[in-house]
Amino acid sequence: GAVFTSPTPDQIYEGIKAIATDKGVLMVIKNYTGDVMNFEMAGEMAQMDDIKVAQVVVDDDVAVDGSLYTVGRRGVAGTVFVHKIAGAKAEEGAELEEVQRVAQKVIDNVRTMGVAIRPCTVPAAGKPGFELGEDEMEVGIGIHGEPGTHKEKLRPADEIVDHLLDKILADIDYTGREVAVMVNSSGATPLMELFIINNHVADVLAEKGIKVYKTFVGEYMTSLEMEGFSVSLLRLDDEM
């Protein structure tokens, strides 16, 4: 599809056919209305060709419970964990139902929230998706250049991290659990700043008795030249 739009059902269908095996295909869909509709149509087309298809819908964003783009929460950077862990299960030779089950388990245990201090230019529109002053930040951003939930005055990095983690930790109970952490650049935020952010994430989690098993810092799911970041926490068990 074009930048920030879903691929068409025909394109998705061709992709399914290109990778299909006897075990079938798992579609990992981010929860945006157009994506869900097009992928489900493509899945039905593939099933008519006797290709076994299953799906999961990722909705890890704690910032919104509904928007112009979604019914329910959006799928954002936590989708990377779904891809990697479901992919590892598939690589073990697991059946499609098992891969789907593990993917859904990741979705149930991952939460994400992000913030931006500079928008990106949406190619089809030729202008930024939202406006920000020099002293403002956009809280609760998605991944398609769309605005977040609200604007706030720009704050120090540690305070921004505190705000994001408060929302994430209030959504599911991470107390006493091991987690994987992802600090993800929205596109233009340099690694040095991401590691400063991650340092405070680690401090906050340690204070709350949450053990970090592994940390990922970098550009995993970006929005062109947007300057900002998101934090994802995945609650782990032995399988994940």
Description of each model-found segment:
Residues 2-10, 30-34, 69-77, 155, ...:
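Alpha-helix capping and helix-loop boundary segments enriched in small/acidic/polar residues
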Residues 1, 7, 30-33, 57-63, ...:
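Short, ordered loop/turn segments at secondary-structure junctions
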Residues 167-240:
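C-terminal non-catalytic interaction/assembly regions of soluble proteins
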Residues 1-23, 169:
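Glycine-rich oxoanion-binding loops at beta->alpha junctions
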Residues 64, 90-196:
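Mixed-charge interfacial surface used for oligomerization/domain docking
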Residues 2, 24-33, 40-43, 54-57, ...:
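Short glycine-rich or small-residue beta-strand-to-loop segments that form or flank ligand, phosphate
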Residues 36-50, 69, 193-199:
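Short Gly/Thr/Asp-enriched flexible loops that form oxyanion-binding sites at enzyme active sites
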Residues 21-22, 36-38, 51-98, 104-112:
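Active-site histidine-anchored catalytic micro-motif
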